[in-house]
Amino acid sequence: MLAPKQRNQNAFHLAGVIPVAGQPLDFNFDWSDCLMPLAPNYTAVERSVIECAYAGCETIWIVCNDDVSPLIRHRIGELVYDPIWYGRVFDPRPSESRKTIPIYYVPIHPKDREKRDCLGWSVLHGAVTAFKIGAKISKWLTPNKYYVSFPYGVYEPELLRDYRKDISSTKPFYLSYKDKTIADGEYLGFTFDGKDFVRYRRVIRKEGTGMWDGSELVDNKFATKKLPVEKRYSARFFSLDKIFRSAILEDAVVSELPWYHNIDSWENYCNFIGSKNRDRIFRPTEFLLKYREFNPIGEDNEAN
């Protein structure tokens, strides 16, 4: 599953996954929690998009449901430019060599909503969607690896520029802060492949509950007793460390961040806003992060 056939490493495809759909935080605003501002005109999900761009992702998949995707799409658009290729100084025609990174918006499948739609499941759902869609088009579009950026972890996305080669390699890559990674439940970027996907998904399938009590079966097949309401579909409340605790850090590239803030609660968000590190987060140049759309087939967009 999610393991493309062997092909030339020059065709390595890194897909970025930004999980948004999940259990709500305690901000209680009318808009999605991922749209909390980090700086003037700069939101948490936009920082994640820039992080994926600096990491070298060829595509970006934002996992969000239809009730919030229009506003997120209004902020971000359908593409972002690769910051490494955008303003190359020694390129005689830099505008012609710019690389666009398409952005796709993926809703959680209706059968999974209110059943196992935690933030960790959004990561896995984004990866499997990227794989299935790419495989239907061409084997060259199936991702080799997936890079995950969480809107609720704040650090400088530009730091990923120095690790692009490590991220787009066969070795796993993890960001860490004070020796803690995604395996400890922190919102830190990391990569995974098809084998990791199966291992993470197994946690949700085996440890998550359904509607029926599997401890009492008739003919060892049929459940006849329902679980109490509060115990049904427990996977929707699974934390990141529960799902990704099996992350294999041995032989992986682990990069220690100079600073990092968790903003998954109002208290943590206030700590970031009151810290000196907030001045290190600012909206990139308009040419890099701006609402853009792909031209429809057969139509000219004169505005661009």
Q: What is each stretch, according to the model?
A:
Residues P70-P143:
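Short phosphate-binding loop-to-helix
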Residues I137-K145, G153-P258, D300, N304:
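Conserved core of the sugar-phosphate nucleotidyltransferase
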Residues D26, V68-H74, A183:
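Short, charged/polar "capping" segments at the starts of alpha-helices
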Residues N41, C64-V68:
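Residues in the short beta-alpha loop(s) of Rossmann-like NAD(P)-binding domains
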Residues M1-M36, Y42, R47, A53-T59, ...:
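N-terminal nucleotide-binding beta1-loop-alpha1 segment
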Residues I248, V254-N304:
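C-terminal catalytic/acceptor-binding lobe
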Residues I60-N65, S176:
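Short internal beta-strands
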